[in-house]
Every structure is written in structure tokens, then in C-alpha cells.
Amino acid sequence: MAGRATIPARNSALIAMIADEDTVVGFLMAGVGNVDIRRKTNYLIVDSKTTVRQIEDAFKEFSARDDIAIILLSQYIANMIRFLVDSYNKPVPAILEIPSKDHPYDPAHDSVLSRVKYLFSAESVSQR
């Protein structure tokens, strides 16, 4: 299949998280957390003191790491850096927006879902 992006195969990859404390702790208790040899974690806990700049930096760092396959973002945090999330176009790491305890999930704001809807609507139109 010419023109398709290849996804490198590896034995293991990490899930990164940018979310509120309760969400991150839940995933850490499930065994998703990691601290590498340079003491870098695969998560950022966002609270009222976290700046948008820190969130942007964490997103850029996680999306550039080759050991991360998925980045989980609480949707309300993704809305803070929507321009970065919407402009991200690589297949790996995949960006998934998730709900949080205090902020419900709204499919209208999910950039991945809107891209899929556009793809299927464009595909269905081109097949007619």
C-alpha cells in the first residue's frame, strides 16, 4: 500500500497521560506509570497551579518520545491546548481524549472523532 505511513513494530511502548490527579492516579494504580533512567515520567498531573505552557511542553515532549504509543488527554485539558492537538497529525503516538471526574466527555470537541467523521463522509461521497 503505497503512500501509507508505516507504524514501527516494537516489543513494548508506554501510555502517557496529561490529566487531573484522580485520573492519573487511577491509571498509575493500574500499572501504567513509568519513570525512566533520567527520572522522566510518562504523566503530567494538572491542577489549578499548572500553567498552559507546562501542559504544552508536556504534550510536545510526550509526542516526540519514541517510547510512547498513546497519549491520553483529559478533554478539558485538550481544550486548553486545542491548537496543538488539532495540528498533530502523526499516527504514533495516538492522541485520545478521555473524560475526567469533574468534566464529562463531549464528542463535539474531540478532534480525532471529527477527523474520522470527515474521513468517512468524504470517503462515502467519493464512492458514489
Curated annotation (Swiss-Prot):
It is found in: Vacuole membrane. It holds the Pfam family ATP-synt_F. Keywords: Hydrogen ion transport, Ion transport, Membrane, Transport, Vacuole. GO terms for molecular function: proton-transporting ATPase activity, rotational mechanism. GO terms for cellular component: cytosol; Golgi apparatus; plant-type vacuole; plasma membrane; proton-transporting V-type ATPase, V1 domain; vacuolar membrane; vacuole. The keyword Flavoprotein does not apply. It is a peripheral membrane protein. InterPro entries: ATPase_V1-cplx_f_g_su, ATPase_V1-cplx_fsu_euk, ATPase_V1_fsu_sf. The keyword Glycosyltransferase does not apply. Belongs to the V-ATPase F subunit family. V-ATPase is a heteromultimeric enzyme composed of a peripheral catalytic V1 complex (components A to H) attached to an integral membrane V0 proton pore complex (components: a, c, c'', d and e). Subunit of the peripheral V1 complex of vacuolar ATPase essential for assembly or catalytic function. V-ATPase is responsible for acidifying a variety of intracellular compartments in eukaryotic cells. NCBIfam families: V_ATP_synt_F. This is V-type proton ATPase subunit F. It comes from Arabidopsis thaliana (Mouse-ear cress).
